[in-house]
Curated annotation (Swiss-Prot):
Residues 720-744, 891-970, 995-1055, 1067-1119, 1205-1227 are annotated as: Disordered. The modification Phosphoserine is found at residues 953, 1092. Keywords: Golgi apparatus, Guanine-nucleotide releasing factor, Phosphoprotein, Repeat. Residues 390-526 form the cDENN domain. Residues 528-644 form the dDENN domain. Residues 1075-1090 have a biased composition (Pro residues). It comes from the Eukaryota. This is DENN domain-containing protein 4B.
């Protein structure tokens, strides 16, 4: 799969302004409709001077000055009024353009403070008297005005003071809108009212024509289908309109103005824009006479005479549009383009730089965390990957919000947004508006603003201010030079840090906020505001390349830390505000009705309100009825695209404590590492065109202004090898359910894993929970491939209940979430309700994502039709029928007991007759005939424990005989044993026709327990016996006298463990079994039907001279075989191996062996599965485990071996025959294998009778990394997210992703969970299927594939010492699965094995350990066993007694006691050095949770 290219940083480049092509400008100017009362015309010139005159001293107002004689409300005022000796000062000001304007005023109390830098003190009047504004006398500090002037050459468009006024608060006057009030009182004396000076800053300019902006150019020309260029972009690029202005001829061009804006789509998606506004020359020829007169170009007295010394300029803008708010990068790029257009000449056109930036600069990603773009040798910009956070990405700047408004005003605006008021934010800096408005809508997270939102509103859209709905609008402050704001709008001036509101629409008091969370928020913001005042330096200057590569991250890191702390303070407040809201959610539990999506039906409003503080009820009453809260409850109930962010907020709610008066020590918004890689991608400027040899480089492109874009000069996308495709919408995984965890869930799971790693029990349960999570990740593919999808969903539901009964600790809710979404997808709302009830019973409160999937399944799925009364009556009828059946059950059981007693009596009589007949004709060829139904069955003693062929099958009944340790051929005991076995298995009466067999071996015996076969298959434990059953028992009874030897009575009491071990300690006396090749089947023999386990047992081919059940080397039987009994034994591979489905006894076409036992190369020791699990680290990126012997890390391996018995090139007919359940097996049935050690030897090719036509089995081996469930889950989630869940059902999965596949197969088989993975192995061997649907190999015949999990290694090391349990089997002459390839040390004799077993049987484990240590000798001179002492003794005991006869828990206790006893004499360190310690508690708990693999 090709790597997807990262998305573009910029999608469009546009040019906006007045229409070009030299056409005349329309006569009508563009004036927007007034949205408020009109103000008087603004002044044409700024204030350049301010003065103070003393009326009492006879001073007059200077020429050109204006005197302030009344307050803003029209009240007459006089400074120092009524005081003797007062000078009666009056403030005057003058307008003009002869000098730079004033930009700031101040009031200075002499002696108490020093003037601010850059300010001048107005200490004298124009007539050289004192300009003190305070009354004379002691106690009154001398008060002077101070001012600051704009710098020389600031230009025509420099901001300046445009108006002054005085206010009297005692008369009820407030600060006028858009004015800034000085905090110092101009009348500080005891007499007279307080007087404050206010001033207004703005742009004072005249002779301007305003028109609506138009689109002059764009690139690319074609719209992207997923992101078309909005038509309103030009008016946002020039929000105050495209203007034509008349300037003095020598006026310098002002610095370009940078602005940002946000366009919101109908679906709520945002498009970010950045524009650079600048002026350029405009030809006079395009102006009409009327327009020229309006601009002041023609004399108003002498008609038609042009005035000299004037220049005409027009405003234009260039802009970029993107889905990413990378405003600093956009500013640098647009500034570079503007400089490029006013300089030159250049060898490359401007269009080449535009297309190069759009196509070749991607948005930073984890693979490219830092991108350094070099636009020219002197212009560079650095792009860094945003901080990974669950919070939505936006263009908000909380630092600018806090710096512009301060802590108290910021909290006041938070209250206004929460109660959905009309907010109008204005400033003279257009780039500040977007950052602050974005912060306003971001600080109410998780609530989402639902009303109109325009961070930078153009004049053409100013009528939104009169809308009757709440809104957040940002606008340029010059708008208020013409209009007053509406009465019901709250205005916020970012330049003066003031809030203007009327009495009609007044905000709630901040005291209505929750008391303690409000105090914590205010204290936190105040502290950060002080830090911001000290460290914040504003936007960075033009950055050099050296700065970008060295100090940029340090500077940005400090800003990012403060940014996240301010955002975290608001987030904590919102978490405290909504604490406990999930308790009041109302889930849907029945078929939905009208109004099911109403907030009253989804949320208990009154209950939530009563749970809050009484002082805050007024706030909550308004908040609960807002549109954004209703939308929030709907998103929590039915899910949305913001589910990851909502889940993160829920985790924040759990962390906060509203009753505390200090914030939590752990920050809610953490700064994460951007990437572990320090990779910086360097993007060079576009290449200059190649020149012919010998020619000189001549610049070709020179611009007088920003040129008109020419399509032929853009570099086409095909010419760029690294070009990025046009971005489309983000593609989700193809799978319908989304089983992916959110980033917050991954963090929580990581923390849980780290805590669980310190507690052994929790670590094992943590791994088990992740294993179940793996299965549910694969559940969508399993359900799609199932014949009955509804049944598959119910299977998953039973797995959930099994997890609950097993007290499995789940790290997240993915298991429940996947099942609920599948219920929604396949229309199973009732099952979804049952899953929700299971969650509640397990004490799990569903998070936002799970809760949304649940309600969606209940709301959108079709509920079953029918009335509840009908279902209730059917249920009652069902109960009546079941009750009647239960009453008849005792009668049926009594009849069966009587029939069994009669049959036993008849069997005993028949056995005696058969025994006499067999004694006289044991050497003759048997003749099989159909027995009568009452023919007695003979008994054979064997172990009927768990099936060695099917680890998933439950253990069957254990059938034992009496004490038969020295009995050889005990006839009555054998007969009684077979009868007891048949009674335990519930075998029916024999039926069928006699079939002559000619073979000297008996078939395999495999018991599946008491689980019935689905579908009533005749292959189960309750199937009927064939006609040959009794004849086979006759053959067994005839061999009894010939075997000879001692006989014990059948009624001898059973021996204990010590007696059984003593009985088993003579295995080496038997001679090796001779193998007799069986004759081939007659060609005319019809294929036999499927048989039960007892059918296979009772089918003789050729009567051997003695009984075929060998027990001295058995893991489960209790009697020995004589030498003669082994001499005629012919071992062949069973053709009726158990597969995944009980009752299937067909030879598997493909056998898979898996083992996780791995070798530590550091100490040459084998580490077993539970030890590997205990050594894993709680890290989803660490593949290593820790060796329990040398503590060295290493990567464990999962060994895989596949044995394929199918033909090499199967034809369609043969392929179908090989998979048929009734296909005959060449060679007939195999021998009776009542011994587990004999079962382990069936993988030898020479012992197989299940191969086709004698062909050898194809064996393929491999080893892959054995992954922790944490690591495997991360890799599987990545695979599903990138390729969809369909990849888990493709036959290419084993070859394309072998590590993931084999690890999944190992865990699923280990936990006995159904899956389609075994079928994928079979399909991958056949190759992809092109002519048929994948269902045949997704649900293969269970007999086709068999998976066996082994505890020990698959292939032994020939250079190492053999394990003791293998030596026991070698001494016992029992064929192995793999013949030991190396020599056997003489010290590891049979006597040693017998001694070890004897000590174990006598509860003297310490002696067994000491004996082994003494025999091996001290390292490094002694023998080196790859397995530890604990493992050697355990495996030897299990090989001698059988796995089901060994209580591993009791063995661990005994071994621990023996270790402590030896440690007192030898020391624990010495025992550990010689690898005699037992597994750690963590390893033992892992084995307890997962269970030991059934085979060695």
């Amino acid at each position: 799969m090709a790597e997807e290219r990262p998305p573009r940083l910029v999608d469009y480049f546009v040019v906006a302004g007045l229409a070009g092509n030299g056409a005349p400008i329309p006569e009508e100017t563009w004036v927007p409709e007034p949205s408020g009362p009109l103000r008087p015309p603004r002044p044409a010139e700024p204030i350049t001077d301010v003065a103070v005159i003393a009326r009492a001293l006879g001073e007059e107002v200077p020429q050109g000055y204006t005197c302030i004689q009344a307050s803003a409300g029209g009240h007459p005022l006089e400074l120092s009024a009524g005081l003797l000796g007062g000078t009666q000062p009056v403030i005057c000001y003058r307008r003009g353009r002869d000098k730079p304007p004033l930009v700031e005023l101040g009031v200075l109390y002499e002696g108490k403070e020093r003037p601010k830098p850059g300010f001048q003190v107005l200490d004298t009047t124009p007539y050289s008297h004192s300009a003190n504004l305070a009354p004379p006398g002691p106690g009154h500090p001398r008060t002077y005005l101070t001012y600051r002037r704009a710098a020389e050459g600031a230009g025509l468009h420099a901001l300046g003071i445009t108006d002054l006024c005085l206010v009297l608060p005692s008369k009820g006057e407030g600060t006028p809108h858009t004015y800034c009030r000085l905090p110092r009182n101009l009348n500080p004396g005891m007499w007279g009212p307080a007087v404050y000076l206010c001033y207004k800053v703005g742009l004072a300019k005249a002779n301007t024509l305003v028109y609506e902006a138009e689109l002059l150019g764009r690139y690319p020309e074609e719209d992207n289908e997923a992101f078309p260029l909005p038509e309103s972009v030009p008016v946002f690029c020039l929000p105050m309109g495209a203007t034509i202005e008349c300037w003095p001829a020598q006026t310098k061009y002002p610095v370009p103005v940078f602005s940002t804006f946000v366009l919101t789509g109908a679906a709520g998606d945002k498009v970010y824009g950045a524009a650079l506004q600048f002026y350029e020359a405009f030809p006079r020829a395009r102006l009409s006479e009327r327009q020229a007169r309006a601009l002041g170009l023609l004399s108003a007295v002498e008609r038609g005479r042009a005035l000299g010394g004037r220049a005409v300029r027009s405003r234009r803008a260039i802009a970029v549009l993107s889905r990413w708010p990378a405003f600093p990068a956009f500013r640098a790029f647009l500034t570079f383009l503007y400089r490029y257009s006013v300089s030159g000449p250049h060898r490359l056109p401007l269009e080449a730089h535009i297309s190069h930036f759009i196509h070749n600069v991607p948005f930073p990603s984890p693979q490219r965390p830092r991108i350094l773009v070099q636009m020219s040798p002197y212009d560079n910009l650095l792009l860094c990957q945003p901080v990974s956070s669950p919070l939505p990405l936006s263009g908000a700047s909380f630092l600018q919000l806090l710096q512009s408004l301060g802590p108290e005003l910021a909290i006041t605006l938070l209250l206004a947004v929460l109660t959905e008021h009309k907010l109008l934010v204005h400033s003279l800096r257009p780039d500040l508006l977007t950052s602050v408005c974005e912060a306003l809508v971001s600080m109410i997270f998780p609530l989402h603003w639902q009303c109109p939102y325009i961070p930078l509103c153009p004049l053409v859209l100013a009528d939104v201010l009169s809308a009757p709905v709440p809104f957040i609008v940002g606008i340029h402050s010059s708008y208020f030079d013409l209009h007053d704001p509406p009465a019901d709008v709250i205005c916020v001036d970012l330049d003066t840090n003031t809030l203007f509101q009327t009495e009609e629409k007044k905000l709630l008091s901040p005291r209505t906020l929750p008391r303690r969370p409000y105090k914590v928020l205010l204290a936190t913001l105040t502290n950060l505001y002080q830090q911001l005042d000290q460290t914040y330096t504003g936007p960075e200057e033009e950055a050099s390349l050296e700065f970008l590569l060295t100090d940029y991250e340090a500077v940005c890191g400090r800003r990012a830390r403060l940014e996240r702390e301010v955002q975290g303070a608001f987030l904590r407040f919102m978490a405290c505000l909504l604490k406990g809201y999930r308790v009041f959610l109302r889930p849907l539990t029945q078929a939905p009705s009208e109004g099911a999506r109403d907030v009253d039906n989804l949320f208990f409003l009154q209950g939530f309100l009563k749970s809050r503080e009484r002082s805050s009820h007024k706030l909550y009453s308004q908040l609960l009825h807002t549109q954004m809260f209703s939308q929030f409850i709907e998103e929590c109930s039915f899910g949305s695209a913001r589910h990851a962010a909502l889940e993160f907020f829920d985790s924040c709610v759990e962390k906060v404590h509203p009753e505390q008066e200090k914030p939590e020590p752990t920050p809610l918004v953490e700064l994460e590492e951007l990437s572990g890689s320090e990779l910086t991608v360097f993007i060079t400027p576009p290449e200059e065109p190649a020149l012919p040899e010998g020619s000189e480089s001549t610049p070709q492109y020179c611009y007088d202004g920003f040129p008109e874009l020419r399509a032929e000069l853009f570099e086409s996308l095909q010419e760029q090898p690294g070009a990025l495709p046009v971005p489309g919408p983000s593609r989700s995984a193809p799978s319908s359910p989304a089983p992916r965890r959110t980033k917050q869930e991954m963090k929580v799971a990581q923390r849980m894993a780290q805590k669980s790693a310190a507690v052994p029990e929790l670590w094992a349960r943590c791994l088990l929970g992740h294993c179940y999570g793996l299965w549910f990740l694969c559940l969508p593919a399993y359900v799609r491939s199932a014949p009955s999808r509804v049944q598959a969903l119910h299977t998953a539901y039973h797995v959930l209940r099994q997890m609950e009964s097993g007290k499995v600790v789940l790290p997240d809710e993915v298991c429940y979430r996947v099942l609920m979404q599948l219920c929604s997808h396949y229309g199973q709302p009732v099952l979804s309700v049952r899953v929700m009830l299971e969650m509640r019973q397990a004490g799990i409160v569903p998070n936002t994502i799970t809760y949304g999937y649940y309600n969606k399944a209940v709301l959108e799925s079709k509920w079953p039709s029918g009335t509840p009364g009908g279902r209730l009556r059917w249920a009652k009828l069902r109960n009546v029928v079941l009750g009647a059946a239960q009453f008849r059950q005792p009668l049926r059981e009594r009849q069966q007991q009587q029939q069994q007693q009669q049959q036993q009596q008849q069997q005993q009589q028949q056995e005696q007759v058969s025994a006499h007949q067999e004694a006289g004709s044991s050497q003759a060829e048997p003749y099989l005939e159909r027995p009568s139904p009452t023919r007695p069955l003979q008994r054979q003693t064997t172990w009927a424990g768990r099936s060695l062929r099917d680890p998933a099958s439950p253990p069957g009944r254990l059938v034992k005989s009496g004490s038969l340790g020295s009995a050889r051929g005990a006839q009555p005991t054998v007969e009684a044993g077979v009868a007891h076995m048949i009674e335990a298995l519930g075998v029916l009466e024999p039926r069928g026709s006699p079939v002559p067999w000619h073979d000297g071996s008996l078939s395999d015996l495999s018991l599946t327990g008491e689980e019935p076969l689905p579908g009533g298959s005749p292959g189960g434990s309750g199937s009927a016996l064939s006609a040959q059953s009794t004849e086979a028992l006759e053959g067994l009874s005839g061999r009894g006298p010939k075997a000879g030897g001692r006989q014990d009575e059948a009624g001898t009491p059973r021996r204990g463990l010590g007696a059984r071990l003593q009985q088993l300690l003579t295995p080496s006396r038997h001679s090796p079994a001779s193998r007799i090749p069986p004759p081939e089947l007659p060609p005319d023999l019809p294929p036999p039907a499927r048989r039960s386990p007892m059918d296979s047992l009772l089918h003789p081919r050729e009567r051997p001279g003695s009984t075929a059940s060998e027990s001295s080397a058995s893991l489960g039987s209790e009697w020995d075989l004589s030498e003669s009994s082994l001499s005629n034994l012919s071992l062949r591979r069973s053709s009726e191996r158990l597969s995944d489905t009980p009752g299937s006894f067909q030879s598997p076409s493909l056998e898979i062996l898996l083992s996780s036992c791995s070798l530590c190369r550091a100490c040459d020791s084998l580490v077993y599965d539970e030890e590997i699990m205990a050594g894993w680290a709680p890290d989803d990126s660490n593949l290593n485990t820790t060796c329990p012997f040398c503590a060295c890390p290493f990567v464990p391996l999962l060994s895989v071996q596949t044995l394929d018995s199918r033909p090499s090139v199967p034809s369609p007919k043969s392929a179908g025959a090989s998979g048929s359940k009734d296909a005959p097996v060449p060679g007939g049935p195999g021998p009776v294998l009542s011994d587990r050690r004999l079962c382990l030897a069936l993988d030898e090719p020479q012992l197989c009778n299940g191969h086709m036509g004698g062909a050898s089995r194809r064996v393929e081996s491999g080893a892959w990394a054995y992954l922790s469930p944490l690591v495997l889950r991360k890799e599987l989630e990545s695979l599903v997210e990138n390729e969809g869940s369909e990849v888990l059902a493709l036959p290419e999965l084993p070859s394309a992703h072998p590590i993931i596949f084999w690890n999944l197969l190992w865990y699923f088989q280990r936990l006995r969970l159904p899956s389609i993975l075994p079928g994928l192995v079979l399909a991958s061997c056949d190759g992809p299927s092109h002519s048929q649907a994948p269902s045949p190999w997704l649900t293969p015949d269970p007999a086709s594939v068999q998976v066996r999990l082994l505890w020990d290694v698959l292939t032994p090391d020939p250079n190492s010492c053999p394990p003791l349990y293998v030596l026991w089997r070698v001494h016992s002459q029992i064929p192995q699965r793999v013949v030991w390839p190396g020599p056997v040390p003489a010290s590891l004799s049979l006597a040693l094995l017998e001694s070890v077993l004897r000590h174990v049987g006598l509860n003297e484990v310490h002696k067994a350990v000491g004996l082994l240590l003494e025999t091996l000798g001290p390292p490094p001179t002694g023998l080196h066993l790859q397995r530890g002492i604990y493992r050697e003794i355990l495996f030897l005991t299990m090989a001698a007694l059988g796995k089901d006869h060994v209580d591993i828990v009791a063995f661990d206790k005994k071994y621990k006691s023996a270790f402590n006893k030896l440690a007192s004499s030898m020391g624990k360190e010495e025992l550990r050095h010689r690898r005699a310690q037992m597994p750690t508690p963590k390893a033992i708990d892992c084995r307890k949770c997962f269970g030991a693999p059934p085979e060695c």
